[in-house]
């Protein structure tokens, strides 16, 4: 992992001259497209960019390669999936390791047997409400 830092710095060295030339331009030259003016976006969309297109491709390729290298580097540290098929298979502990005198019965929070049971509400027939065999 410590060897990755010099590699990344070496890969970023070609971007330094491009960044220094971009800072020499005035801000008006740098912003052709103003995002706070969305009505002029279509006019700006067709203008040629000051940033060379091959740099975008180079940065994209470097991004893909560095992410791939980083993921391949850290992948073996994860202990799941097919790297470690027994990662979730916890060993079964024997039940004899707890002495029987130390096992406490759970306290009953509510003792239902001692509580008086509420009486059921009286049943009212449908026929009594309507007045007969309607």
Curated annotation (Swiss-Prot):
<keyword id="KW-1043">Host membrane</keyword>
<keyword id="KW-0325">Glycoprotein</keyword>
<dbReference type="InterPro" id="IPR008131">
    <property type="entry name" value="Adeno_E3_14_5"/>
</dbReference>
<keyword id="KW-0244">Early protein</keyword>
<keyword id="KW-0597">Phosphoprotein</keyword>
<comment type="function">
    <text>Down-regulates the EGF receptor and prevents cytolysis by TNF.</text>
</comment>
<comment type="similarity">
    <text>Belongs to the adenoviridae E3_14 family.</text>
</comment>
<dbReference type="GO" id="GO:0033644">
    <property type="term" value="C:host cell membrane"/>
</dbReference>
<dbReference type="GO" id="GO:0016020">
    <property type="term" value="C:membrane"/>
</dbReference>
<dbReference type="GO" id="GO:0009966">
    <property type="term" value="P:regulation of signal transduction"/>
</dbReference>
<keyword id="KW-1133">Transmembrane helix</keyword>
<dbReference type="Pfam" id="PF04834">
    <property type="entry name" value="Adeno_E3_14_5"/>
</dbReference>
<feature type="signal peptide">
    <location>
        <begin position="1"/>
        <end position="21"/>
    </location>
</feature>
<protein>
    <recommendedName>
        <fullName>Early E3B 14.5 kDa protein</fullName>
    </recommendedName>
</protein>
<keyword id="KW-0472">Membrane</keyword>
<keyword id="KW-0732">Signal</keyword>
<keyword id="KW-0812">Transmembrane</keyword>
<feature type="transmembrane region" description="Helical">
    <location>
        <begin position="54"/>
        <end position="78"/>
    </location>
</feature>
